[in-house]
Amino acid sequence: MRDETPEQPALLRSGYTTGSCATVTSLAAARLLLSGIASDVAEIVLPKGQHVPMKLVFCRLLNDGKDGAEAGTIKDAGDDPDVTHGAIVFARVRLADAPGVRFHAGPGVGTVTRAGLTLAVGEPAINPVPRQMMTAHLTDLAAEYGYAGGFEVAIGVENGEALAQKTMNPRLGIVGGLSILGTTGIVRPFSCSAYIASIHQGIDVARANGYRHIAACTGNASEDAMRAYYQLPDIALIEMGDFAGAVLKHLKRAPVDKLSMCGGFGKLSKLAAGHLDLHSRNSSIDLRQLAQWCASHAASNATLQAAIVGANTSQEALAMALKEGVPLGDIVCARARDVAREIVPASVEVEMFAIDRQGNIVGEAR
């Protein structure tokens, strides 16, 4: 997850997806094989029609062309930081007798080993839109040169296997490296679309592998709490980060039997107030709201409520309430559960768990 930045520039720079990088490098390598021309720059057309020139860091024959050709470009994510920013994405292309394009996982690109994704088990983790982009460009290239054969395309990412450990790929059953992603070809700054897509994939993989109880967690401590509480395997633990809404809305289309949500007390207080994006950039902890919720409990009093309004942090407010016998953690969890119930199908059993900074459960509601 990203740290909050106090000031955002007025205009943020977009970047390009790994799918765009794979397309431009496969096109350049194939063009070298068909024309003998090694390019420094190649232009592709994105799914929405934009023409984009991209620089190449290499474009060369392999073994004088006997082993095909390869081209590489540096992944530029713009002002949207991700694990692949600055990595070299490359394509190795061979000509084939049979028409069409066949895809392979090169070094640093993973292979699908679990059901539930948009790709079949055993396929390279090159998502559908990047496949469509590469196929369209290579088909046009073949027509341009009067070439009737096909292409064998292996996509790789420098250091991709190590980078993949920083993603959800291992949990999704994508082994050996990264996924080649993208739907528009462009990375929008702070759109978080890739992260949200991985949340959806995590739910789909859990369902496809027979897990009807999932736990959506805001971070490592909440995951550890749910793993210990329910002995759930990693495949049933969904790392939602701040995107509670991404989980709840996806369950409308892909429901499970039971959803356990677990997060820090402060983050769950935001969900309880109706916020579905829990990042501090987009929602704030409301101490006055916490004080009002306390007021509904018999053990509460005006002194406690005033102290909560003046608290430095939500954790301090929680400690004050608990000291006075007010189960503020349970109150917040009950309200967060009710918000979630309004979104997911009625058939989904929802429960909430709040933890403190040490990972201890300080509130729950079923």
Swiss-Prot record:
Gene3D superfamilies the record matches: CbiD-like (3.30.2110.10)
InterPro entries the record matches: CbiD, CbiD_sf
Superkingdom in the source lineage: Bacteria
Protein EC: 2.1.1.195
Keyword Aminoacyl-tRNA synthetase in record: no
Molecular function terms, GO-annotated: cobalt-precorrin-5B C1-methyltransferase activity
Gene Ontology BP, a term: methylation
The protein's name in its UniProt record: Cobalt-precorrin-5B C(1)-methyltransferase
Pfam family, one: CbiD
Secretion signal span: none
Catalysis performed (reactions): Co-precorrin-5B + S-adenosyl-L-methionine = Co-precorrin-6A + S-adenosyl-L-homocysteine
Pathway: Cofactor biosynthesis; adenosylcobalamin biosynthesis; cob(II)yrinate a,c-diamide from sirohydrochlorin (anaerobic route): step 6/10
Family: Belongs to the CbiD family.
Alphabetical UniProt keywords: Cobalamin biosynthesis, Methyltransferase, S-adenosyl-L-methionine, Transferase
SUPFAM superfamilies for the chain: CbiD-like (SSF111342)
